[in-house]
Amino acid sequence: MAVQTDIREAQLAQFTAGYIEALYWSSTDIDEDGETVNIDQFEASTQAGDHCRAACREFFEANYADLIAATEQQRGYSFEHAGHDFALTRNRHGAGYWDRGLDDTGRRLTEAAHNAGECWPYIGDDDLIYIH
């Protein structure tokens, strides 16, 4: 049983890493000079890290069977890819679960991601990433 738990935690870690990477590189903010800045150039606050880990754990646990199906259904599709798609799909970017050729699995994951609601990173006054 401990081995299964270790595997599942490793899958969650991969999912979370993919989510954070996609959430940050796909997001921008406006600096004090009115210039657009890429979020991924900044360090994450504790709040951002906690928010991302909690959101990923909740989605991962609630949709684990479909995430497993997705990784088995499409060759080369990993938990990291699935985390990436969670970030893009929940924020309704132009790519995500729905365009992976995952059929019903993709539709269920898309609906679940949309139900999770959008979340947007921003840069705080301390130049750290926060999530609202």
Could you describe each region identified by the protein language model?
Residues A54-D125:
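Amphipathic protein-protein interaction modules
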Residues A22, N38, W98-R100, I131:
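Intrinsically disordered, low-complexity, compositionally biased regions/tails
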Residues M1-A70:
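Long, contiguous N-terminal structural blocks used for assembly/anchoring
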Residues D125-H132:
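Long, highly charged low-complexity segments enriched in Glu/Asp and Lys/Arg with interspersed Ser/Thr
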